[in-house]
């Protein structure tokens, strides 16, 4: 870290890692504290493990340029692959791990995750400091008895027969080995896995671990996939891993720069896809310097605040709406356009100063016909009203305990939301003052 700060890096903070930097899956294994969210796709994909917070933050925050992590058996490459960003496992022993808590000293390596390969290369250069080739030239001059004690049979075989160093210092590596790590498959965070079994087999991701070679993740693009979480087509990243000969780390980073310059790779963006796009939920907060920053963090069961297009897409042509219990009217057949205009208005859910969270309790379903279903839900709707859209100062709170009927109809073969009827049981604090247009002044104070 001192090397980075010497080059002008500003350390922003620390990030979540899995317990003991071990291999864990979201929800199933993250027990003591919550796993970070992967912002890509439907926002409900596993962020991978160990350096999960580093990968999630780089894919989520535009103001964050670089994240440091460690890779023992894939702890940088895994988060990089599933979140479609650049990440590297350096040649083992190239970078000092003095004062770092070890997991496996013979396998541990530090590395970076980044969206911009130019910045990634500059950070790697700061970490390496000296030319890696000069380090290995020095190592090659040492007695073979010392080297043999630090190599395994696989390492010798691979580095001598599969991917040896080139005699040309400009090319460094005799070749490159490519393997696929991120293949755009859904790995949802709400799945529970089988009990652990003895390890079996050997994956391509383990080559660099045992051969001590550099292995880096290159995001190639993204592909569409239908999500069972959002019921929409989302986009998942596709990545490839590039392995070079031991000590040829700079070659890989320069290759990424050249591929961006040639238009083959891209500088990546934050969001639901590697080319951008809104994440399922947004939070506003203010840094110490007073600049407003929008962090986009995914959250289960929550649509993007003000993602009105997504809401419009699930509405039936007409809706039954009974808002009499929250100070509005009742409509037997409100058009979808009128419903959108009402809920998105500044005096209702479109108010940027209002934040709300709906917690659903017991639920039952009533099948009225082949084309109509009614959902009956217990509900606690919590609201906070702020003095301004920067959401710094709370003005008032108002919470409602209710049951809610939701209506669904099949329209042209597709199930659509067709209305609602909340039945308020009791309120907490100043619920009547949450929405500006819901109650008249006389009703608020009656």
From Swiss-Prot:
The keyword Lyase applies. Pfam families: Amidase (PF01425), Scytalone_dh (PF02982). It comes from Metarhizium acridum (strain CQMa 102). It comes from the Eukaryota. PANTHER family: AMIDASE 1. It is an enzyme of class 4 (lyase). This is Scytalone dehydratase-like protein Arp1. The gene is Arp1. The keyword Lyase applies. One of its GO terms (molecular function) is lyase activity. Scytalone dehydratase-like protein; part of the Pks2 gene cluster that mediates the formation of infectious structures (appressoria), enabling these fungi to kill insects faster. The product of the Pks2 gene cluster is different from the one of Pks1 and has still not been identified. Keywords: Lyase. Belongs to the scytalone dehydratase family.
